[in-house]
Amino acid sequence: MDPALAETAAGAAMAKQEGSRTIRVLPLGDSITQGGRSDRPEYTYRYPLYFMLKDAGYDVDFIGSQRAGLEESATWPDQNGMAFDADHEGHYGWTTAEVRDHLQEWLSKYPAPPDITLIDLGSNDQEADSYQTAIVEPLKDIVAMLREKNPNVVVLLGHILANGRKARSIRPLLEQIARETRTPISPVETVLHYKNWHERPGLPYSDTFDWAHPNLSGQRKMADNYFAAMRPYLDRLQSSEVGVAHRAQSE
């Protein structure tokens, strides 16, 4: 275990001694979240992230109405004898508005609402006539729906995995959403997945199978990004009875 994970694991262990709770994590998105093609290891970021969190000592429960990938035959292997928690809310090919339109139904069926929601949406909206209608308004609605179930939910909004012109034009909109929707008790933060991202397939350092879907390298990069974004909230969430989450006073 690297020093950063070791330090985090020690903090998590201390929280457990004081009385811990399970942190509910909702992976919400499109194919980047669902994955699961059987012809390639399309495990998504969820797979390495889950084991990173467990290795760091956190009691996490991935939630969602889905467990399968795009193809039912796709599998996620155990790691060091530990099974992967495959629950998620990823839907291959869906737009932001389509996810928004089904979210209330999904949330009503979860045993408990998420403490942290990881959102990866917008890739299927890049050809939309209006990003305001296709991305901004649905994402704001999604944040509002999540808060109806948990006023303290932490929302981590992933940037599109691309560096093309259309993806770049969407970036300031996501930053605007975060600024306008974050509150002292319910943070909304962006995750800059596009940094150090190489989408051209076939290169030794490529992060995708096909320009869009992360390969093993890309999946690990996304997991690293999400883990770093989650860290300011994990200890507080795990040791809190009500799941109140906000940044440390020093930040």
Can you describe what each PLM-predicted range is?
Residues G35-T133, E137, G164-R168, P172:
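Conserved SGNH/GDSL esterase-like catalytic core that processes O-acyl groups on lipids
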Residues G81-D87, L161-S250:
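Catalytic His-Asp segment of secreted/periplasmic serine-dependent ester chemistry enzymes
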Residues M14-G19, M52, R100-P114, A144-N150, ...:
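Surface-exposed acidic, glycine-flexible loop patches that form ligand/cofactor-binding
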Residues M1-R67, L234-E251:
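N-terminal secretory targeting modules
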Residues R24-G29, T33-Q34, V60-S65, D115-L121, ...:
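Structural recognition of the beta-strand scaffold that forms the well-ordered cores
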Residues T44-P48, Y131-R182, Y226-M230:
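Extracytoplasmic, non-cytosolic globular domains
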Residues S20, D55-G57, N150, E180-I185:
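Short, well-ordered coil/turn elements that cap or connect secondary structure elements
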Residues A4, D115, N152, V188, ...:
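Generic low-complexity segments that are intrinsically disordered, proline-rich and/or Lys/Arg-biased
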